[in-house]
Amino acid sequence: MEQQPLQPQQGELNWRLSAHPITLLFFLGFRIGALLMYLFGVLFIKNFVLVFIITLLILSADFYYLKNIAGRRLVGLRWWNEVNTSSGDSTWVFESSDPTTRTITATDKRFFWLSLYVTPALWIGLAILAIIRLSSVIWLSLVAIALALTITNTVAFSRCDRFSQASTFANSALSGGVMSNLAGGLLGRLFK
């Protein structure tokens, strides 16, 4: 008797299960590409300045792509920063897609959040190694830039997710409360 090969289940780390595979592959490509260029760029490109610039460009592309494209398409979240020109105050604005109109796959969610939290942890590890080695302060500056960009996105998307969950809960409670009051009022009038 032949056994059927197991079909991948939603939520597994398999890019083919993604609702947006191209978005996911670019997202992971930028995240992994910056780390690989930092770690192995000097082996293939002998010019340190070129490795620094390429790594910085990949980090910038990762920051932009995650903030403006991948977050919105993979998990339905987006954030930006607004500055009040008169007072100079800075506020973060969070946006989430309507959960009733958009379904987010478990695979996309898992890839997104895992990558979002693992990448800064890897950069922190590389920062510790750069401090221990003390071989070049310039490498530490590149890691500091990478940490600033990845941690900013991590904190912003974490807050955006909390905001999204709170607003979803508030909307469901509000709509449930309004409907129960409306139904109670109608039933009360019928049986008076």
Swiss-Prot record:
The chain crosses the membrane at residues 17-37, 39-59, 112-132, 137-157. Its main location: Golgi. GO terms for biological process: protein secretion; vesicle-mediated transport. It is found in: Golgi apparatus membrane. Pfam families: DUF846. The keyword Transmembrane applies. Keywords: Glycoprotein, Golgi apparatus, Membrane, Transmembrane, Transmembrane helix. GO terms for cellular component: Golgi membrane. Glycans are attached at residue 84. It is a multi-pass membrane protein. Belongs to the TVP23 family. Golgi membrane protein involved in vesicular trafficking. This is Golgi apparatus membrane protein tvp23. It comes from Aspergillus niger (strain ATCC MYA-4892 / CBS 513.88 / FGSC A1513). The gene is tvp23.
